[in-house]
Amino acid sequence: MKNVLILTLMVFFVAPLVAQAGNVGITKDLMSITVQTEKGPIKIIRNQDNKAVINPGFAKTSRKCPPFCVQPHTVAPGVQTVGELEVIKFMEKGGLIIDARTVEWHVKGTIPGSKSIPYTQIASRLNEIGCKKGAKWDCSNAKTVLLFCNGLWCGQSPTAIRAMLREGYPASKILYYRNGMQGWQSLGLTVIEGEMS
């Protein structure tokens, strides 16, 4: 009888503690991925603390509009809007992720492996993503890139995308992560401090 009592106590008190360790997956089949950054490999996981809450910087629901207006789901014809799982798959394939936010936002925290090209500079820095400068940009060898900013209410990456398109970047080579940092952080995904560019 004593053994049954001990076993029952273990099931009710110890098993939940064991189950909590590593119980927050990205999907039911994926716990983490590792991406290469300039500082070495970084593991992308979700926060394993079931009581964690979103970063207070992204908890606000109402920001003055303009400038913080809700952005359209489709930022431009031909540009594909993606969610978190598509971002992770893009990362796994070594895709180039662009943090289109200002440097001040970028250094506070960014998606690991992302490159900071602020929306105010992107039109003059297309050479960093496969275009060649001439009388006009030649983007025939442009890389497929994924851009993000702060989230649904942030216009920095949509502004960057429109600037890229205006300069001749092919829409089919641009992915737009509309949920941005707010969506990334709401899922407890890994964030690192950005570097000054």
Where are the predicted features?
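Active-site neighborhoods of enzymes that stabilize oxyanions during catalysis
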Residues: 187-197
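Bacterial N-terminal signal peptides
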Residues: 6-16
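Flexible, polar/low-complexity N-terminal or interdomain linker segments that lie immediately upstream
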Residues: 19-96, 105, 197
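Short, solvent-exposed loop/turn and secondary-structure capping segments
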Residues: 108-111, 158-161, 187-188
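Catalytic cysteine-centered active loop of the rhodanese-like fold, especially the PTP/DSP P-loop
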Residues: 132-183
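Positively charged, proline/Ser/Thr-rich regional signature most characteristic
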Residues: 70-153, 194
